Amino acid sequence: MAAFRSTTAHMLRESKEYARQTLMGGLSGFESPVGLDRRDRLQALKSGDIGFVHSWDINTSVDGPGTRMTVFMSGCPLRCQYCQNPDTWKMRDGQPVYLDDMIKKVDRYKDLFKATGGGITFSGGESMMQPAFVSRVFRAAREMGVHTCLDTSGFLGRNYSDEQIDDIDL
C-alpha cells in the first residue's frame, strides 16, 4: 500500500507540474534575456524591447470578455490594502520577457480569442509602470485583430498618450 501511495503521489506531482508548465501559463514558453547587464536591461525596458512579467494565464474569468490571455506585469508603486496580487508589487520579482516572444504568444492564441470573443489583458502589479512594452504588445495585438484590455488603477495614467490609448478596447 505504501508503494502505491508513493507512486500515486509522484504521478500527481508530475501531472501538476505538467499542467503548470503547459496549461496554467506561469512563464513557460518565454525565453528570458540572458547576458544583458543592468544598463542594457533598463534601456530595453524603457524602449519596450523587454517587459518584466510576473506570470500569465489563459482564462475565462473576470479579466475581460471571452477567453483571455491575462499577463500579470511586475511592479506597482501602490500598496493597496486589499490588493488581489500583492506578489506582483516588486519589479525585481518579475522575469524579463522579450517583446517578440510576447507577440508570438498572442499570435499563437489569436484564433481562440476570435472564436470566443476574447483577447489579451494586461494586469499586474501596475501595467502602466511599463508603458512602452504594454503599448507595443497592444499595437501588435490590434494589428492581428485581437481585443485588448488594460486592468489598471489609473494612478500612472499620465504615462499613456492618447495615441496609445487608441490601441486599448477596454
Regions inferred by a protein language model and the residue ranges of each:
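N-terminal [4Fe-4S]-dependent radical SAM core
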Residues: 2-72, 81, 85-93, 108-116
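Conserved Radical SAM active-site core
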Residues: 12, 36, 51, 67, ...
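Glycine-centered loop/turn positions within well-structured domains
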Residues: 78
